[in-house]
Structure formats: C-alpha cells, structure tokens
Amino acid sequence: MISYPNIDPIAVSIGPISVHWYGIMYLIGFAGAYLCGMYRAKRSNGLWTPEMVSDAIFYGALGVILGGRVGYILFYQFPAFVDNPLILVRIWEGGMSFHGGLLGVIIAMFFFARRYNKHLVDVTDFLAPFVPIGLGAGRLGNFIGGELWGKPTDVSWAMIFPNDPLQLARHPSQLYQFALEGVALFCILWFFSQRTKPRYCVSGMFLLFYGIFRILVEFVREPDIQIGYIAFGWLTEGQLLSLPMVIIGAGLIMAGLKLNTFPKASTSK
C-alpha cells in the first residue's frame, strides 16, 4: 500500500479568503487550453485568430462552470435541489459534473460559432484536443482534495484517503482518470489532429475515447453514495451518461469520413 500524500486542499489563505487547489486546477486547465489554442491558431492558415481563441476560451469557461454545476445538481443531487433550490448557487460547497460541463460548453460554443459565422463542429474539432488538459488538472484536484476515490482493493498501490469514513485501502481512481482522461486522451487527440481532419472526426474521437475511458474507470471507482448503482449491481450513473458518448462519437467519425468535408475560413459578424 502507498501512503496518501495528505496535501492541504487549501493552497493559499489570505485573511478570510481561501484559494483551493481545485480552483487552481481549473485555472491551469483554462490556461493550458489557451496556450495550446494560440499555438494551433498560428498554424491554422487563417482559420483561427488569437482573438477567436481568447473568446472561445471565455465562452468555454462559462459553459464549463455553469453547465458543470447545473449538471451536477440535476444528475446527482436532484432530490436535494427539489427540497432546497438554493443549493444550485452554493458552488463553494463543491460539486461539478463533467457531463453537465460538456453540455454547457456545447451550448456556449453554439453562440460562439454564430458570432464568428463558423460551423459549430469546426469549433468543437479545433477545441477538443485542449479539453483533456482541464480534465487531467481537475482529476489531480480531486486527488488532492481526497474525494471521488475508488473501490476497496488489495493492490500494492492502494491508498487510504483521510476523508473516507471506513478508512479502507482503495484504488486511487482519480489518478487513473488523470492518466486516461488527461494524459492519454490529450496525446490521442493532439497527434490525431496534427493535420486537418474531415469535419466531425476530432470531436468524434474525443467523445469516443472519453466515453470508453470513463466507463472503464467507473468499474473501480466508488459510486456516488446518494445514487449507488443504477442497475445490475454494477452500472453507475457515470457509465450510463458515457455510453451515449461512445455511440455518438463513433457515429461522428463515420459521418466525417463519409462526408469528407473540411473547415472553411470565416469572419465575425
């Protein structure tokens, strides 16, 4: 068993203000996406400008935060929301959903695409390779916060998390997700998109591989206590939400290869 590196989840405290590592990880994710976007924009043959990248990151940040919070409440805390709707705005208490954040980003990118007269999927194809930076950083934030741990296990790298009331040796599933949803997914998408691919393909690859990785990790991740298993004694909410991503992702890749259309330059309205 490996000792859990008990890091204070509060990185900096200035008087009554506390800056949590989880919040810093969000900033790292947005900053990393911005830098990668600027790098790719210079090599886009005029399809993307620095202004477009800056605006896209801003729109995306709004989508992630608003969608992530609303999704968490609807997917994981709906009964509590019905009893007390004010929990929706209590962001400081924690609780964000990837799937809600994804829907929020898609909605935000719809408005961004309209502003710049771009095809929505051209926008998501450009941005998709940068998303794993934020996903990986977020999972490190989960690990530092000692939350979203895995199931009990006897593997040699198991850890006991200080916030676990049962104090059992568990899979460090946050690190598995960091490795798969962060590092592996970034490498796959970054190298796949090095050369311009047909429309839909990069977005499809993101949905396909994220869905696969999330479904796999859910087998060793402790399900949310307020939900438990959805069916069969093993199907989790995360797997149920990720399965459509795999199906849609595969469909987008096939559609992209069949249509074989490519993004076109555009200007703001």
Curated annotation (Swiss-Prot):
Catalyzes the transfer of the diacylglyceryl group from phosphatidylglycerol to the sulfhydryl group of the N-terminal cysteine of a prolipoprotein, the first step in the formation of mature lipoproteins. The chain crosses the membrane at residues 10-30, 56-76, 91-111, 126-146, 172-192, 200-220, 237-257. The gene is lgt. The lineage of its organism: Bacteria, Pseudomonadati, Pseudomonadota, Gammaproteobacteria, Oceanospirillales. Pathway: Protein modification; lipoprotein biosynthesis (diacylglyceryl transfer). It is a multi-pass membrane protein. HAMAP family: Lgt. It comes from the Bacteria. Belongs to the Lgt family. One of its GO terms (cellular component) is plasma membrane. It is an enzyme of class 2 (transferase). GO terms for biological process: lipoprotein biosynthetic process. Disulfide bonds: none annotated. Keywords: Cell inner membrane, Cell membrane, Membrane, Transferase, Transmembrane, Transmembrane helix. This is Phosphatidylglycerol--prolipoprotein diacylglyceryl transferase. The keyword Transferase applies. It is found in: Cell inner membrane. It comes from Marinomonas sp. (strain MWYL1). Pfam families: LGT. Its EC number is 2.5.1.145. PROSITE patterns: LGT.
